C-alpha cells in the first residue's frame, strides 16, 4: 500500500491550520486536534487501500515470439476490471538493455471492461534476455491509497536480427515475381525461358516465337504472335562472407556494424533463395568461425537465422585471405562472392584488397562496406571553430581514403557497394537483382 498525493496534501493541510486553531483555542488543543485529524486521514487511507484488494484488476502481457533488433517491437498489456472503474499505474519490467517508448503506463479502466495498453521496446543487441514481472498500482475509490502489487509474469525473450525487415522484403519480392511490380521480368532480360504470351504494341520483334505462333495459328486460326519471355537464370550460387572482426564491433546508428551486416546477409539470402539460387554463408575473423554450405529452398532461410543469430563480433583482426581461401576450396564453380566488412584506407585494408582481387576473374567478387552517416554529416558541414574544423578535416580525409581504396578494387574487377548502414540491406538486394537481370553471374 502506497499513500497517494491527496494523503500528503491533507496531512500538510492539518499542520498548516494548527496555528490558526491555536489562536482561537489553546496550543495543546491545537496539537491534539491536528493529531486526531492526521490519525483519521491515515485510518481512511488504510481502509481505502484494503477496499481496493477486493476489486483488483487482471493484467496479462502479449509480446512477439521473436523480437527484432533495431526495431520498435509492440508490447500489449490487457487490463480487465470487474465491477468498478480502476485508475492504474503500470510498470512493466522489460530488460534494462532495451529502449522503451513509455516507461510508466497510466490508464482508467471502466468496470466490466477490458482495455489494451500498447508500448514499444527497441532492442539494440541480439541474444536472450530476462523479462521481469508487472508492477501494478491501483488507486482506491477515495483517492487516498494505491494498492501496490507485483504480478508474476517473468520469462526469457530472444532478440533476433531484423525479422520485420525480412518480412517486408519477402512481400516486395513476392509482388515482383507475381507481376504486380514487373521490373523483375521483362523481355530480353535473363537467359531462361519463363512463358509465352501474346504480342503487345511496343514489344521487340526479335523475341517473337514464330514456331509456336505457327502451331497456334494452325490450331486456333488467326491469332496474335507469341512472344518469348525470359527470366534470370536460377540455381546459381551465392556466397556471403560476413566479417565479425574488430572493425565490425563499432556502433553505427545505435547498432554494431556486425548487426547491420547480419541484417544485410539475411536480406540477401532471402532474395537469393526467392530467385531460386543456392545460398551459402561464412562468418570469419582470424579463421572461418562458421560455414553454412549453399542450399536452395525457403527452409534454408530459417536454418540461416537459427545458426547466425547467436554469433557476436570479436576484437580480433580478420584474416581475409584465409576466408577467401576457404571459399575457393569449398566452391570450384563460378559464383557471386559477397564480402560484408568495413574498409578504412588502402594501407589498413591491403589484405582485404589482395583477397578480393584473388577471386577475379574466376569468381565475381563483391565488396560491401557500411558507411557511418555521422562521418558524412561532419565532413559536409562547414565549421568555424578550430576544433570542429580539424574534426571535419579528418572526416574528409577518411572519406577520400575510402574512395581511393574503392577505385583500386574496381580496377581489379571487384564490384563495390558503400552505403549508409541503415540502407545497406535494401541497396544490396537491389544490386543483386540487377546483377541477376544482366546475367553477370
Short names for language-model regions:
Residues 301-304, 374-404:
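Acidic, Ser/Thr-rich peripheral helices and adjacent loops at domain boundaries
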Residues 39-299, 334-339, 347, 354-358:
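An amphipathic, basic-hydrophobic helix/alpha-beta surface used to engage anionic
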Residues 3-9, 210, 348, 432-441:
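C-terminal signal-anchor/stop-transfer transmembrane helix together with its immediate cytosolic
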Residues 290-319:
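Short, charged loop segments at secondary-structure junctions
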Residues 318-371, 418, 438:
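Exposed acidic/Ser/Thr-rich ligand/metal-binding surfaces
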Residues 381-384, 396-441:
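Long, C-terminal catalytic modules of enzymes
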Residues 287, 370-375:
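Short beta-alpha junction loops
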Residues 1-60:
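Extracellular/lumenal glycan-associated context and N-glycosylation machinery
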Amino acid at each position: 500500500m502506497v499513500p497517494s498525493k491527496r494523503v500528503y496534501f491533507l496531512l500538510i493541510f492539518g499542520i498548516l491550520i494548527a496555528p490558526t486553531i491555536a489562536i482561537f483555542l489553546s496550543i495543546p488543543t491545537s496539537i491534539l486536534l491536528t493529531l486526531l485529524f492526521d490519525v483519521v486521514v491515515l485510518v481512511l487511507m488504510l481502509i481505502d487501500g484494503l477496499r481496493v484488494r477486493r476489486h483488483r484488476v487482471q493484467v496479462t502481457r502479449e509480446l512477439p515470439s521473436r523480437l527484432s533488433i533495431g526495431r520498435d517491437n509492440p508490447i500489449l498489456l490487457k487490463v480487465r476490471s470487474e465491477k468498478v472503474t480502476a485508475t492504474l499505474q503500470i510498470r512493466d519490467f522489460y530488460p534494462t538493455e532495451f529502449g522503451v517508448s513509455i516507461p510508466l503506463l497510466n490508464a482508467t479502466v471502466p468496470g466490466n471492461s477490458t482495455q489494451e495498453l500498447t508500448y514499444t521496446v527497441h532492442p539494440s543487441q541480439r541474444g536472450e534476455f530476462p523479462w521481469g514481472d508487472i508492477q501494478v498500482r491501483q488507486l482506491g475509490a477515495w483517492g487516498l491509497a494505491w494498492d501496490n502489487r507485483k504480478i508474476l509474469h517473468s520469462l526469457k525473450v530472444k532478440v533476433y536480427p531484423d525479422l520485420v525487415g525480412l518480412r517486408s522484403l519477402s512481400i516486395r519480392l513476392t509482388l515482383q515475381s507475381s507481376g504486380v511490380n514487373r521490373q523483375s521480368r521483362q523481355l530480353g532480360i535473363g537467359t531462361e525461358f519463363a512463358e509465352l504470351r501474346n504480342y503487345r504494341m511496343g514489344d521487340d520483334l526479335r523475341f517473337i516465337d514464330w514456331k509456336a505462333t505457327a502451331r497456334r495459328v494452325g490450331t486456333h486460326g488467326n491469332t496474335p504472335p507469341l512472344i518469348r519471355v525470359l527470366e534470370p537464370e536460377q540455381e546459381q550460387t551465392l556466397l556471403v562472407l560476413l566479417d565479425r572482426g574488430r572493425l565490425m564491433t563499432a556502433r553505427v546508428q545505435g547498432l554494431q556494424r556486425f548487426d547491420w551486416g547480419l541484417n544485410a546477409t539475411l536480406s540477401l539470402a532471402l532474395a537469393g533463395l526467392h530467385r531460386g539460387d543456392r545460398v551459402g554463408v561464412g562468418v570469419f575473423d582470424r579463421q572461418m568461425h562458421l560455414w553454412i554450405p549453399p542450399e536452395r529452398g525457403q527452409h534454408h532461410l530459417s536454418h540461416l537465422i537459427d545458426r547466425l543469430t547467436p554469433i557476436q563480433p570479436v576484437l580480433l583482426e580478420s584474416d581475409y585471405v584465409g576466408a577467401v581461401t576457404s571459399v575457393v576450396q569449398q566452391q570450384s564453380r563460378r559464383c557471386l562472392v559477397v564480402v560484408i566488412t568495413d574498409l578504412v584506407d588502402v594501407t589498413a585494408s591491403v589484405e582485404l584488397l589482395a583477397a578480393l582481387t584473388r577471386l577475379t576473374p574466376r569468381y565475381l567478387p563483391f565488396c560491401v562496406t557500411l558507411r557511418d552517416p555521422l562521418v558524412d554529416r561532419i565532413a559536409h558541414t562547414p565549421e568555424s571553430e578550430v576544433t570542429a574544423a580539424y574534426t571535419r578535416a579528418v572526416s574528409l580525409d577518411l572519406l577520400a581514403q575510402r574512395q581511393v581504396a574503392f577505385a583500386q578494387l574496381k580496377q581489379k574487377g571487384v564490384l563495390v557497394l558503400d552505403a549508409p548502414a541503415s540502407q545497406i540491406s535494401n541497396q544490396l538486394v537491389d544490386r543483386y537483382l540487377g546483377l541477376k537481370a544482366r546475367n553477370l553471374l
